[in-house]
Amino acid sequence: MPGKRGLGWWWARLPLCLLLSLYGPWMPSSLGKPKGHPHMNSIRIDGDITLGGLFPVHGRGSEGKPCGELKKEKGIHRLEAMLFALDRINNDPDLLPNITLGARILDTCSRDTHALEQSLTFVQALIEKDGTEVRCGSGGPPIITKPERVVGVIGASGSSVSIMVANILRLFKIPQISYASTAPDLSDNSRYDFFSRVVPSDTYQAQAMVDIVRALKWNYVSTVASEGSYGESGVEAFIQKSREDGGVCIAQSVKIPREPKAGEFDKIIRRLLETSNARAVIIFANEDDIRRVLEAARRANQTGHFFWMGSDSWGSKIAPVLHLEEVAEGAVTILPKRMSVRGFDRYFSSRTLDNNRRNIWFAEFWEDNFHCKLSRHALKKGSHVKKCTNRERIGQDSAYEQEGKVQFVIDAVYAMGHALHAMHRDLCPGRVGLCPRMDPVDGTQLLKYIRNVNFSGIAGNPVTFNENGDAPGRYDIYQYQLRNDSAEYKVIGSWTDHLHLRIERMHWPGSGQQLPRSICSLPCQPGERKKTVKGMPCCWHCEPCTGYQYQVDRYTCKTCPYDMRPTENRTGCRPIPIIKLEWGSPWAVLPLFLAVVGIAATLFVVITFVRYNDTPIVKASGRELSYVLLAGIFLCYATTFLMIAEPDLGTCSLRRIFLGLGMSISYAALLTKTNRIYRIFEQGKRSVSAPRFISPASQLAITFSLISLQLLGICVWFVVDPSHSVVDFQDQRTLDPRFARGVLKCDISDLSLICLLGYSMLLMVTCTVYAIKTRGVPETFNEAKPIGFTMYTTCIVWLAFIPIFFGTSQSADKLYIQTTTLTVSVSLSASVSLGMLYMPKVYIILFHPEQNVPKRKRSLKAVVTAATMSNKFTQKGNFRPNGEAKSELCENLEAPALATKQTYVTYTNHAI
């Protein structure tokens, strides 16, 4: 009794009492209808125990109206499901025998504030107004119908409505079982401790949707949520699960206002299009908002652009997609696993205006369902609306499909019935009807029995609750498909703790069975690394591995080892090809040709000289140094073969030895010759005595001394840096690794080559200087001028060699150009010496043997006279062949010399 309540109990309910006092004047009158008759805003069915019911019979009103248009499926179907379940329980002798369940069913109008006002009816009996002192004008007591005591509530539908109602019901310890509210917030047992539901929490639904997104290989999606607990909590759960599982990023997260302004949905579509790659849109919204989003997408000409994924509020409903089939095509929706209740189909199809008077909204449903009017006064002139005949039948004269939550409404009512049955069995054992311990029913005790129920639902599914009052997660997955101008929701999979998705049964607009893309960035190609966008792990830029880098993993490029280059797709490394100058290379043709011809010519000259070794012209050329010079020329030509041969230890050692040795031998011999001529000529200017070291033995000694310096340098080089072959990967390490080559070569650097040839060049320059100094020697004094011409030409060859050789050091064909240039230059130098010094002699020997005769002896005195008096007889000598003026001079001077018997050295046959 109120008088026995504690002070704390009343203090906690003081705000509610004040609220009820405002409604007090109207509520008794509204509840004072005769038994069994409906109210204008609720259904009342009498029984021993009364259950409350909350259903969205109407949608949200506009322009200040609390209620809008009738909801045939979400409202009437579900409401009738509760009435159907009550009838079954009341007629079941094994469930609550001799106890009748009554009901008080209210319309929430899909609005939480309106539902709050309506739900005050459920607690009115708990806060009774003492009317003993109230008297009517006649002095009698007022006629007030005592409100029924509601022991439990079935509903509500929307999560925001359930949350609002749960906050009141928990104060009065009235258990509540929802058939459709799935917001994760309602799992908070500390705030909504008297709330339970036969549908799974959106936490499970969010996990299922994340699994679907991943299975479809989408990683960049947008979310749309209706303002309120259901939409916002659902999207929040989806985002949380996507972060936990990874691999899914949110492009846009849009919230639909509770009272959207004009153009709000067009703005939402424009915002979704800002991230056009995110074609998948996750929708946690009520069906009205879903429909308006689809309409806005059609207005924006985005039919087929978005791929919708709807939560259970969309499910398999027709209303959200009616006349929007093309926009909604391909939509993937999720719905708690359910089965059609055939008994309900028979029940609902049999409802008529005559046998269903307890449903105060059934007449309105009848008019809306059959497009007719019950009253003639409601018919407008000129209207095509007909008058209802009451002979219309559901399913025959109108389309009918069982609403998706009917099963759960029935299961919720049965859960309450089973809990009351177990409670009656324990508290009233053996008693028929209610016992004092259940009159009134204690809500806290009833809640414990509700949480412990375990039975098979109307469709054979198990009905249980966990400690938070949630049902286990079991979902069916649908896709809205258009086939042959007909649209249907087709089951494509299920989810019970993990996903079972039949992708082959899916069909997408424009692409058939090919999975559409909803990704932030396209996958990187092989050889590219991902550079993720900060804060968006699903978005990245693809950066190619450059240069000699290869792809180690998705995020890393690494440089290949120095002797390797990346593969074509840059996913690994492969050895760099090793090149060398091949015998058949075009670069080797000219050097080999010159070398072969030169060696042949050299051997021919040697053979000729050996054959005619004792002839005057061979003797006059200085046989000893001539053969040394020919040996040097031969080595110059032979060096070409060493330069083209494959580099190895032996080849590289021979290159070091013979590359400069052939030239050193040649120029040492020529230098010795020019130096001998110069010394004889200069000595003749000063005295008639012979210069020292002009004998053949001395000349050979000088030549070999000069050559030994070259050999000594080579020996020191071998000791300091032993010869070996190397593969140079830097020489042709091009910017494009496809053209990179390793060059197999000897360890002779450019600096080493300069040092190797430097001594030969020094001999060549010195020889050239002597050739210039002896340019005035008479032609009869052997080879002074031919040697001069040889050295001038050789200098020109090597001056051309230097810029070509060192100017191509950065060329990709450096190996070929430098080797060819070096070998050709050496061969040309040898050819110049061979051609200018020996070919004229060979020509005379072979073709003009008559000229190969001894000349008259010339004395040193003649040489001296020629050196001192040559200018005097220059003009005369120019008119006489072979220096006859000088001969005459010598002959004129010979007689006095004999008379005085002066001693002098005589040279025979011009062997100077």
From Swiss-Prot:
Topology versus the membrane: Multi-pass membrane protein
Residues carrying sugar: N98, N301, N454, N484, N569
Topological domain spans for side Extracellular: 33-587, 646-656, 721-750, 809-821
Keywords: Cell membrane, Disulfide bond, G-protein coupled receptor, Glycoprotein, Membrane, Receptor, Signal, Transducer, Transmembrane, Transmembrane helix
Disulfide bonding pattern of the chain: C67-C109, C249-C538, C372-C388, C428-C435, C520-C539, C524-C542, C545-C557, C560-C573
Subunit structure of this chain's protein: Interacts with PICK1.
PANTHER family: METABOTROPIC GLUTAMATE RECEPTOR (PTHR24060)
Tissue specificity of this protein: Strongly expressed in the cerebellum. Expressed at low levels in hippocampus, hypothalamus and thalamus. No expression detected in liver.
Function: G-protein coupled receptor for glutamate. Ligand binding causes a conformation change that triggers signaling via guanine nucleotide-binding proteins (G proteins) and modulates the activity of down-stream effectors. Signaling inhibits adenylate cyclase activity.
Residue sites binding L-glutamate per the record: S159, A180, S181, T182, Y230, D312, K405
Spans within the Cytoplasmic topological domain: 611-624, 676-699, 773-785, 848-912
Classification via InterPro entries: ANF_lig-bd_rcpt, GPCR_3, GPCR_3_9-Cys_dom, GPCR_3_9-Cys_sf, GPCR_3_C, GPCR_3_CS, GPCR_3_mGluR4, GPCR_3_mtglu_rcpt
Protein name stated in the entry: Metabotropic glutamate receptor 4
One protein family per Pfam: 7tm_3
